[in-house]
Amino acid sequence: MSLDTPNEKPAGKARARKAPASKAGATNAASTSSSTKAITDTLLTVLSGNLQARVPKELVGESGVELAHLLNQVLDQFAASEHRKHVAAQEIDQALDALIGLVREGDLSRWNTTTEDPQLGPLLEGFGKVIETLRTFVREINEAALRLSSSANQVLAASTQHETSSTEQAAAIHETTATMEELKHASAQIAENAGSVARVAEETLGAARAGRGAIGEFIQAMQQIRSDGVAVADSIAKLSKRVERIGTVVEVIDEIADRSDLLALNAALEGSRAGEAGKGFSIVAAEMRRLAENVLDSTKEIKNLITEIREATAAAAGAAEASKSATESGEKLGAVAAQAVEGILAGVQETSDAARVINLATQQQRTATEQVVASMAEIEDVTRQTTQASKQATGAAAELTQLAGRLAELIKRFKAD
């Protein structure tokens, strides 16, 4: 028993000594809880957007003072960083607004935005390079627009002049083509007329040859009556000289034919006076008259060309009327008729040859004219196409000029210097 009592006393002292330690632990726990709550509240306040919130030192215990101090420093740095970000964002917004405003207004010469923030410097420098690039671009486009406008105006002027020239050329070619068409028709008509003249000349030549044969018979009959042909030769020489003085051979035909008709009539009259002896003479005179009338019928188609022949025939008839002797008159007139027929043959031959030459020439002219008309038609078609192309080029040049002017107006909105 006595041994147990001493053992119990020391145990009671131990419990007495442990009581203060438990009280201190409770105090420390309360202080830690208060510090934790203060820190937590502060962090929640910061997270809600209040960057000025700090951990109150009076709300933390001794153990949390150092932690609160460190946390407040961190919050200070965070707030400063957020402030710098905010300032940088404002400067960026201002720079962007300034850039957009300059682009909207077109005045690129007023860009001079600077910053003291080393982090924003490269960004603003990049903006400055963009502006400088835009300035260079605007200047180059402006110069190009001016050159384009000048070139477009020159092209438009040249196209307009070319269009005018093409239109005038087309009108001239059209008029020339119309003239050539008229010439073509005229050449065709001339060719037809020349062919008709050639045919009539051939017919007249045949009639003249027939008349020459009849005149030969008549001369033979005259020679049987009268052998003296000196006066007839003189008359023929005079008539030949007169015929040579006549300007156109065709007119001689009508004159000689008319004269032959009168001579035949006179010969018939003389033959009638001679009675039975002049019967053969009358027959030949009648045949000569018939042939002369045939020649007259043939020469009616070229009446306008043989007026002088009528005059010569009339002159020969007048000379025949002056003859007192029927034999001499018949002999002279027969010789004159023979010479006249020879002249007619020569003249008709020349006329026929000339008509053939003219006919050939007119046919060649007609062919050449048709070729020229065809060529002019092709030229007119090409000219029409050229005129249309010129009008299209003028329209394109005018549109290009308008576009160049529009581009110049747009570029004027931007000021690079």
Swiss-Prot record:
Biased composition (Low complexity): 21-34
InterPro entries with a match to the protein in the record: MCP_chemotaxis, MCPsignal_dom
Superkingdom field: Bacteria
Modification comment: Methylated. Saturated fatty acids capric acid and lauric acid stimulate methylation. Short-chain alcohols, such as isoamyl alcohol, and some other solvents cause demethylation.
One Gene Ontology cellular component: cytoplasm
Single GO MF descriptor: transmembrane signaling receptor activity
Keyword Cytoplasm: yes
Domain Methyl-accepting transducer: 144-380
Subcellular location(s) per record: Cytoplasm
One Pfam short name: MCPsignal
Keyword ATP-binding on entry: no
Biological process terms in GO annotation: chemotaxis; signal transduction
Keyword terms, alphabetized: Chemotaxis, Cytoplasm, Methylation, Transducer
CDD domains: MCP_signal
Region (Disordered), start-end ranges: 1-34
Compositional bias ranges of the Basic and acidic residues kind: 1-11
Function: Methyl-accepting taxis protein necessary for the proper aggregation of cells to form fruiting bodies. Frz genes define a system of signal transduction analogous to the enterobacterial chemotaxis systems.
PANTHER family registered for this protein in UniProt: METHYL-ACCEPTING CHEMOTAXIS PROTEIN 3 (PTHR43531:SF11), PROTEIN ICFG (PTHR43531)
Membership in a protein family: Belongs to the methyl-accepting chemotaxis (MCP) protein family.
Name of the protein described by the UniProt record: Frizzy aggregation protein FrzCD
